[in-house]
Amino acid sequence: MTMRSNKAIVNAAGQTITTAGLAAGGALNPEQAKKFIQQTFEATPLSGLVRHELRSAKTGEIDKIGVGRRLLRKKTENTDDGYRSGVKHGKLEYACTPVRLPWEITEETLRENIEGSNYETIVTNLMTRQIGCDREDLCLNGDERYAKVKEFSPSETYAIGDLVAYNKKVYQYTAAHTAGAFDAGEATELGTVDDADFLKVNDGWVKQFKEGGHVVDVSGINSGAMVLDVFYKGLRAVPDKFNNGTLRWLMSPHRRQEWERYILNQAVTAGGIITDKRVENPASVPVIEVPALPDDVIMLTDPKNLVVVNSYGVVIRKTTEGPEAIYQDKRFYVVHFDFDTLVEELDATAIVTGLASI
């Protein structure tokens, strides 16, 4: 079987990458990096709708330019009253975090799989798609607090809010813990250690919405069950100036189906006809189903208000050399890139919490 070069692997990762050969070491040139990143954005329903920024520097600022409202003034012939409207400038600071996705394929697999010589291409395409899915997951759910997780020790004391790892699971203490054996009654399980290693990369939009946007607790509305008032309360939390037809509900497929079940039950019990438009557009705002979004929140914003920043520093490497490759008869691959997740206007966001479990 003919060995494939770094360039061939990059071309397999994205069929749109057809520009000149790679620089040494698998680094993509700016045009290749742009096309590769674009392919990862196309892998998920939300990523293709958000704002993308490609920068040469890994840290920096993104300009925000805007104008105020009610700027018009009455004109008086042959008179300059000295009035001038202004332009509002702002900055979004970003700092891209490096991430990687490594994988390996044995030479035996390459020789004997049913896909034949296309196997390497198929796997690389799958990995490229997974990069897009994982990045969207991080953009939504990332939380840098998981970097503070420490292995539980019976000789240590822990305060409320501390994070510990125990039996490969992560817990947050809800009560102070004195030295002694681990007691699950003092803490809430948050996920696995692998989840924490993944989520600690960056702070995602869910966390940013909760810390700086409009938080709408609906636990007091029908015990958090899906009703129409949930959406209207969320919509009222966002200032009218942002309610200009570009807002979208972001929710998990399960949450979207729970809303559909509620509205159909209403039609059955109360009578009447529910159009698809009413199901698909609660409070006249379209829904975007986002598989990576947790079931316990609903987000409201213009997708273009969500920003993902990448640098051009994308590297795709493959090696068939070195002791491991020789002794284990394997090929090793890795994709390196970086990103940051921002919200341009937190005032233009709402997040609905306190929803009943489904």
Predicted segments, located by residue:
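Sequence/fold signature of self-assembling virion shell proteins
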Residues: 2-20, 24-43, 53, 58, ...
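Assembly/oligomerization interface modules of large self-assembling protein complexes
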Residues: 20-104, 124-125
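Alpha-helical scaffold segments that mediate packing/assembly in large oligomeric complexes
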Residues: 107-151, 155, 159, 192-237, ...
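Short, polar loop/linker segments at the starts of domains and inter-domain junctions
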Residues: 79, 122, 181-188, 219-225, ...
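Beta-edge loop/turn motif
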Residues: 245-257
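Short, flexible beta-strand-to-coil junctions
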Residues: 166-168, 174-176, 253-255, 302-304, ...
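Tryptophan-rich substrate-binding surfaces of secreted polymer-degrading and adhesive proteins
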Residues: 148-196
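Intrinsically disordered or highly flexible coil/loop and linker segments, enriched in small
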Residues: 46, 132-144, 244, 268, ...
